[in-house]
Swiss-Prot record:
<feature type="binding site">
    <location>
        <position position="44"/>
    </location>
    <ligand>
        <name>Zn(2+) 1</name>
    </ligand>
</feature>
<dbReference type="Pfam" id="PF00107">
    <property type="entry name" value="ADH_zinc_N"/>
</dbReference>
<dbReference type="GO" id="GO:0005737">
    <property type="term" value="C:cytoplasm"/>
</dbReference>
<keyword id="KW-0862">Zinc</keyword>
<feature type="binding site">
    <location>
        <begin position="180"/>
        <end position="186"/>
    </location>
    <ligand>
        <name>NAD(+)</name>
    </ligand>
</feature>
<feature type="binding site">
    <location>
        <position position="114"/>
    </location>
    <ligand>
        <name>Zn(2+) 2</name>
    </ligand>
</feature>
<feature type="binding site">
    <location>
        <position position="156"/>
    </location>
    <ligand>
        <name>Zn(2+) 1</name>
    </ligand>
</feature>
<dbReference type="GO" id="GO:0004022">
    <property type="term" value="F:alcohol dehydrogenase (NAD+) activity"/>
</dbReference>
<feature type="binding site">
    <location>
        <position position="67"/>
    </location>
    <ligand>
        <name>Zn(2+) 1</name>
    </ligand>
</feature>
<dbReference type="Pfam" id="PF08240">
    <property type="entry name" value="ADH_N"/>
</dbReference>
<comment type="subunit">
    <text>Homotetramer.</text>
</comment>
<dbReference type="InterPro" id="IPR020843">
    <property type="entry name" value="PKS_ER"/>
</dbReference>
<feature type="binding site">
    <location>
        <position position="106"/>
    </location>
    <ligand>
        <name>Zn(2+) 2</name>
    </ligand>
</feature>
<keyword id="KW-0520">NAD</keyword>
<keyword id="KW-0560">Oxidoreductase</keyword>
<dbReference type="InterPro" id="IPR013154">
    <property type="entry name" value="ADH-like_N"/>
</dbReference>
<dbReference type="GO" id="GO:0008270">
    <property type="term" value="F:zinc ion binding"/>
</dbReference>
Length: 352
């Protein structure tokens, strides 16, 4: 396949400034890398943080964001075997762009925790461009029966919430409270939870998000902006008023992280996934100990988690709710995201 020398991309020139739609050189893959012609890229709240530069994690600048890219392999390095990727294969570029594959973390299938990991759209350029590079070992193969536009959100949001649900330890028939249920991660978390046999309580705000959550199978929707007592409402929605077996925190504000231990049941798990800037997670030591509450973080997923998350979609168990928009509209999408006005996920159409 012929590859041009230049391409269109959304480039953040300086942290805190909106991306600029401009032409940049097309990167060339290294020996162990693939070059993917992007068809679609999801827009994640992480991309907004990368633009703002408000995380305690240095990013490259200028930066091409994005880490939910789905497309077709158009070039590859000499070390990439055909059984891994051939020219023309469908491929996904995820948040974890590459890792060393030889440290203790990588050896025990915790590649996201690799101290040498490269992160798409953060420490290396990501998927808000026509052509993106990724390490072949970490890229995802997208099944032929999964549409590329629908696959894009699965590559980060889907994998992340699927991993978080596994980390929660919740078993079929048990109840999971999903905080931020109406967003891109939350809309997928509800579906993965249902497919895993879990019952869900959706916590978010707004009529549009309520309608979407109910359509996705939430047994109860709690609007935190209208509720006089979120803790009491969650408990009231569970058998015996004992609280949720697990809480999945996808929120981008600090308060839900302080509140979750109040409505998780004894011996339950609070799983922190959302990353509000400059926030802290606090809980009373006495209550946490005597109620045996498990508080943990869950960070994206490893290669096998990615395979499993895509397989759920391929088997028709997940329907990613998303809206399409052209790559040129990214700044406006960031504005809506910052205002909390997006239900589901936006997927960018990358120009040919």
């Amino acid at each position: 396949m012929s590859v041009p020398e230049v391409q269109w991309a959304q480039v953040v020139e300086k942290a805190g400034t909106p991306p600029v739609y401009k032409q940049v050189p097309v990167p060339k893959p290294g020996p162990d890398e693939i070059l993917v012609k992007m068809r679609y890229s999801g827009v994640c709240h992480t991309d907004l943080h990368a633009m703002k530069g408000d995380w305690p994690l240095p990013s490259k600048m200028p930066l091409i964001g994005g880490h939910e890219g789905a497309g077709v392999v158009v070039a590859k390095g000499e070390l990439v075997k055909d059984e891994d990727f051939k020219i023309g294969d469908r491929a996904g570029i995820k948040w974890l762009n590459g890792s060393c594959l030889s440290c203790e973390m990588c050896m025990q299938a915790d590649e996201p925790l690799c101290p040498h990991a490269s992160l798409s759209g953060y420490t290396v350029d990501g998927t808000f461009q026509q052509y993106t590079i990724g390490k072949a070992a970490l890229a995802s193969k997208i099944p032929d029966n999964v549409p590329l536009d629908a696959a894009a959100p699965i590559l980060c949001a889907g994998i992340t919430v699927y991993k978080g649900l596994k980390e929660s330890g919740a078993r079929p028939g048990q109840t999971v409270a999903i905080v931020g249920a109406g967003g891109g991660l939350g809309s997928l978390a509800q579906q993965y939870a249902k497919a895993m046999g879990l019952r869900t309580i959706a916590i978010d705000s707004g009529d549009e998000k309520k309608a979407m959550c109910e359509q996705l199978g939430a047994e109860v929707f709690i609007d935190f902006s209208k509720s006089a007592d979120v803790v009491a409402d969650v408990k009231a929605a569970t058998p015996g008023g004992l609280g949720a077996h697990a809480v999945i925190l996808l929120a981008v504000a600090e308060k839900p992280f302080q509140q979750a231990t109040e409505y998780v049941r004894s011996h339950g798990s609070v799983v922190a996934i959302g990353l509000p800037a400059n926030a802290f997670l606090k809980a009373p030591v006495f209550t946490t100990v005597v109620r045996m509450i498990n508080i943990k973080g869950s960070y994206v997923g490893n290669r096998q988690d990615g395979v499993e998350a895509l397989d759920f979609f391929a088997r028709g168990l997940i329907k990613a709710p998303f809206k399409k928009a052209p790559l040129q509209d990214l700044p406006q999408i960031f504005e809506l995201m910052g205002q909390g006005k997006i239900a589901g996920r936006y997927v960018l159409e990358i120009p040919e």
